[in-house]
Amino acid sequence: MKRGYEVVRDPHLNK
């Protein structure tokens, strides 16, 4: 994860 809003931009970082 990055900060919280970046996970939304990056689906692969969502989980």
Swiss-Prot record:
Intracellular or extracellular location(s): Cytoplasm
One example of a Gene Ontology biological process annotation: protein homotetramerization
Keywords, sorted A to Z: Cytoplasm, NADP, Oxidoreductase
Catalytic activity: (S)-malate + NADP(+) = pyruvate + CO2 + NADPH; oxaloacetate + H(+) = pyruvate + CO2
Cofactor or coenzyme needed: Mg(2+); Mn(2+)
GO cellular component: cytoplasm
Major location category of this protein: cytoplasm
One Gene Ontology MF term: malate dehydrogenase (decarboxylating) (NADP+) activity
Its EC number(s): 1.1.1.40
Transmembrane parts of this sequence: none
Top-level EC class as recorded in UniProt: oxidoreductase
Manner of cofactor binding, per the entry note: Divalent metal cations. Prefers magnesium or manganese.
Family stated for the protein in its record: Belongs to the malic enzymes family.
Primary role: Catalyzes the oxidative decarboxylation of (S)-malate in the presence of NADP (+) and divalent metal ions, and decarboxylation of oxaloacetate.
Assembly mode: Homotetramer.
Protein name stated in the entry: NADP-dependent malic enzyme
Gene this protein is translated from: ME1
